[in-house]
Amino acid sequence: MIKFLSALILLLVTTAAQAERIRDLTSVQGVRQNSLIGYGLVVGLDGTGDQTTQTPFTTQTLNNMLSQLGITVPTGTNMQLKNVAAVMVTASLPPFGRQGQTIDVVVSSMGNAKSLRGGTLLMTPLKGVDSQVYALAQGNILVGGAGASAGGSSVQVNQLNGGRITNGAVIERELPSQFGVGNTLNLQLNDEDFSMAQQIADTINRVRGYGSATALDARAIQVRVPSGNSSQVRFLADIQNMQVNVTPQDAKVVINSRTGSVVMNREVTLDSCAVAQGNLSVTVNRQANVSQPDTPFGGGQTVVTPQTQIDLRQSGGSLQSVRSSASLNNVVRALNALGATPIDLMSILQSMQSAGCLRAKLEII
């Protein structure tokens, strides 16, 4: 019986403390991506490009490109083009990116083009914040949306004014790296946590020797490494595969006010409370009343007068009891029992936190 209880306690402890690799919890300070941006032209559109009379920068860009290719456009020429669009091109330069390596680019219309489907991005230099060209982008655009229009009716699925080119840019310039310089580097936690930072430092010290790692704060752990690139690569490879017991994270509820989505982690709990939620609906009806003269040849005029009716209804919500819930499943059941919409649920969660019934951090994005 004692052995059974000991095994059960050990099982519960190992289940509560989940082991994770250090590489999944941290990143190396200084090893990061860098944003690139460029301005270019997309050609080959099927009549869905910019209306050049309303987007003069498209025509100006096209004239500059043609002049660089040795083609002179007569002054005052009004080019009515529908298969060209001005776009912004963005990409991320990966850490340790080498010359000749390809990266993905995102192409977004900046004019009034209807769609970029079927278009080809012409050679576009991508620059960093230092105005240096780090990559050149060119290729056929893949647009995930779809749309059609006929007879004054149209239908559209997803976004047509943006697309992606897989491996659409070639790196032409490398960023200087400080990796391998010095005898220390910092590991940055993905989420600030004092206990996790100390656990990682203790784990490294147990394997590599005391003094190998020091927790600087809730985000950074300083690690002593051997000098030289190859030695540091091997050292980091060993450290990143070490296992650390992950402590329960902070209870948090994230609300997206634009989409109405609500996401919560498993640490969220509720205390007993009572909730009443009323719904307010506004209905606007507008009709056109036509008044015509009684005599057809009396010289009167037909008059159209709009008539608008506004109906305001508010349904009173009954007071409902929400029981104390200690697990995520019980929290979900308790909130679903209220029968509230996602928009109402956001207000309810905010009120619960103000009343001290929601045991979690509330974050609105």
UniProtKB/Swiss-Prot annotation:
Membrane-crossing residue ranges in chain numbering: none
Source superkingdom: Bacteria
Signal sequence, start to end: 1-19
Keyword annotations: Bacterial flagellum, Periplasm, Signal
Gene Ontology terms, MF aspect: structural molecule activity
Gene Ontology CC annotation, any one: bacterial-type flagellum basal body, distal rod, P ring
Role summary: Assembles around the rod to form the L-ring and probably protects the motor/basal body from shearing forces during rotation.
Subunit structure: The basal body constitutes a major portion of the flagellar organelle and consists of four rings (L,P,S, and M) mounted on a central rod.
Stated name of the protein: Flagellar P-ring protein
Higher taxonomy: Bacteria, Pseudomonadati, Pseudomonadota, Gammaproteobacteria, Enterobacterales
Gene of this entry: flgI
